[in-house]
């Protein structure tokens, strides 16, 4: 694994404060100490105690972590574009896992690798689409096994189907 490059986040992105980030997605304060993230309140729910799963730097102007990493190393986002996590893991902010895509493409990618909490306690509903595999460079069987772990299923996924499992 290559040594990450550390760079100062442009002060205008973080309310004039000093913050550093690495290409591995880790953040550091001016003293070189690791900075913890918090989760942003969800704007897409009517339940005020719910949080989205996008980590953000609250003490640094409420900026989303993956936006800070991308904009620090690549530059400002193109107007109307969104930052996507290539592997679907919202906690992986490494620069090689981030890309700029259109909102429509981002929604399409998100629905292929989604895990939704069912209303029935202890049930998960998963949706998988085989055409999402084109974004991964690994054998199909290896990817299916990885996705089975990711979606909390005890067995490989039956592709292009909606299914339920007891967890």
Language-model segments: residues:
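Conserved recognition-core residues within compact binding domains
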Residues: 1-82, 89-164
């Amino acid at each position: 694994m290559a040594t990450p490059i550390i760079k100062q986040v442009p002060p205008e992105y973080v309310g004039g404060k000093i913050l550093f980030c690495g290409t591995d997605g880790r953040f550091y304060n001016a003293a070189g100490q690791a900075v913890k993230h918090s989760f942003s309140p969800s704007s897409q729910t009517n339940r005020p105690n719910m949080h989205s799963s996008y980590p953000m730097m609250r003490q640094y102007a409420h900026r989303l972590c993956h936006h800070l990493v991308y904009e620090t190393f690549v530059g400002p986002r193109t107007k109307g574009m969104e930052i996507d996590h290539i592997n679907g893991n919202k906690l992986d902010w490494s620069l090689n896992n981030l890309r700029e895509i259109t909102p429509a493409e981002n929604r399409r990618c998100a629905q292929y690798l989604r895990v939704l909490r069912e209303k029935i306690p202890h049930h998960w509903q998963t949706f998988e689409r085989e055409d999402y595999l084109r974004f991964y460079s690994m054998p199909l069987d290896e990817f299916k096994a990885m996705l089975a772990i990711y979606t909390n299923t005890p067995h490989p996924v039956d592709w292009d189907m909606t299914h339920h499992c007891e967890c």
